[in-house]
Amino acid sequence: MHNYSVYGRRKLWKAARRAGIDAGRDQVARLMAAEGLRGASRAKKRFTTKADPAHVRAPDLVGRNFVADRPDALWVADFTYCSTWSGIVYVAFVVDVYSRRIVGWKAARSMTTALVLDALNMAAWTRRHAALDGLVCHNDAGSQYTSIAYTDRLDEIGAAPSIGTVADSYDNAMAESTNALFKTELHRNPAALAANGGPWKGLDDLEVATCGWVSWFNTERIHGELDDRTPAEVEAAYHRAHPRTEAA
């Protein structure tokens, strides 16, 4: 039962029950204590946002209300940085608010428009069979997200841009939460570092590990905000209940 060694006792108990293991919550807590295990704690956010005053900013269409009634109604996007032996690696994510699924991501050595644009393009490809008309894509006011290339691509896929403020985590809270989970569960996770054979060497090994973590995050990691289901399970349940919304 792989979980990157990040689950606390409640989530590990839930995961055990999902796996058919008949263990009580107190029993799980005792076993964790006996083995010296504890859940991962998230690190404090450090801001990487740099606004460009020359760029035209879209309005904030979200207003900190990160709620959606279906997949592909609202995406949030952001990027974070990771230290490695060979320098900083930046990782960008695009997250579907309804299911918390990471629909697009990209790792690169510089925080350019290409970084966030590639993550957006992956998201569009991931949802290539879905109708994206009516989609809102919310970001902070970083220059990468207000660039002409990025906003033009949003227009091409039928998404409306929404921009929060600079260096305010509440204005892009769900994206910030995903960044924090990534840093805690992969980049700074002792279990992940051990599996890597030591500290991250650079873009290549971190990129491969990120690919594995994103797959686990989407299909195996249970989320308390999703009633202890995975993003894939939440989307599958939606499409079973709304078969007509799926593209032919």
Question: Would you name each region that the model predicts?
Answer:
Residues 1-248:
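Charged DNA-binding/catalytic regions of mobile-element recombinases
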